[in-house]
Regions:
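Membrane-embedded alpha-helices and immediately adjacent juxtamembrane helical segments
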Residues: 1-296
Length: 296
């Protein structure tokens, strides 16, 4: 495989920024931020129903609670009360038709991602709407299953850390406890990296190798961690959101956070495509593997 020089990598980085702007990535990030907020609660309702059916309700609640604790408090303040209500138990009167509606709404976010990623990868002829929508629902179901399995793994590690002293009859020093907490953080980052890579790999209507999507996924995860840290500092020291929007400040802060995170996600896809072009590789559309996707 061709090796890229640091200058070529910087060129790919810059071209990805340019393409993100040219492909309306800034505007699409706002669209995805809205879909993220719109699909969040239906997805949680559906996922709670699934983990309840599997008998893992407490595991799911512990996992979602740990995620809420990891996110900036100003962002989750407006969302947390309803999220806590949902993970405490499915809404009363939840019918089959409601589950179907939740799946449809949550899959809209997947469909939005597909549209944007197809544009980033220059897909000339996307599939028919019914096929795209069917794929979105199927991929949502697969993503839900993988998320549940990831919940079990992460929560199992948390349980191990909290009970290691009782199980093994040993006392952990503060250094050992810090090491185990860092290990849990790295596991969470690893799960996040695999999740982003899987989205880049599975959702766009192209055939590609999994390894080719990992550079952009790595940039996205690092970018998200940096944004979460900087956004927390901003809200703590420059509380303009609450001053301007009042009681709506929490919702607006969440939308802004999702907006920036989605912009980074779109940039990661553009960066992957620039790397593919720099390496002289070609990607092929799934519905017609005999033709290469035209590049621009």
């Amino acid at each position: 495989m061709t090796r890229l020089t640091p200058k070529q990598l910087c060129r790919c980085f810059w071209d990805a920024i340019v393409k993100t702007i040219q492909h309306d990535g800034i505007e699409h990030a706002g669209y995805l931020a809205f879909l993220t907020l719109l699909a969040l609660f239906p997805f949680l309702v559906f996922m709670v129903a699934v983990i309840g059916f599997l008998g893992q309700g407490e595991t799911g609640a512990a996992f979602i609670t740990s995620i809420l604790q990891a996110l900036p408090g100003h962002i989750t303040s407006a969302l947390k009360p309803r999220i806590v209500e949902i993970i405490s138990g499915p809404p009363q009167g939840l019918l089959t038709i409601s589950i179907v509606g939740a799946i449809w709404t949550a899959s809209s976010a997947v469909e939005g991602l597909r549209t944007i990623l197809n544009r980033a990868y220059h897909v000339a002829t996307p599939p028919a709407y019914w096929l795209r929508r069917s794929l979105s629902i199927l991929q949502l179901l697969i993503f839900t299953f993988i998320t549940v399995m990831g919940m079990v793994a992460v929560v199992a590690v948390q349980v191990f850390i909290h009970h290691v002293e009782d199980w093994f009859g040993m006392r952990l020093t503060p250094e050992n406890q810090a090491y185990l907490q860092n290990m849990l953080l790295f596991i969470f980052i690893g799960v996040l990296f695999i999740g982003v890579s899987s989205v880049y790999y599975a959702i766009p209507n192209i055939k590609q190798r999994f390894i080719s999507v990992t550079p952009g996924a790595l940039l996205v995860v690092l970018g998200w961690l940096g944004v979460a840290y900087l956004f927390t500092l901003y809200l703590l020291n420059f509380n303009q959101v609450q001053l301007i929007y009042g009681s709506l400040g929490g919702i607006i802060a969440a939308l802004v956070f999702f907006y920036v995170c989605n912009m980074i996600f779109i940039f990661g896809a553009e960066f992957n495509h620039q790397l593919i072009e720099a390496l002289g590789l070609r990607v092929r559309q799934r519905e017609d593997v005999g033709k290469s996707v035209p590049t621009q």
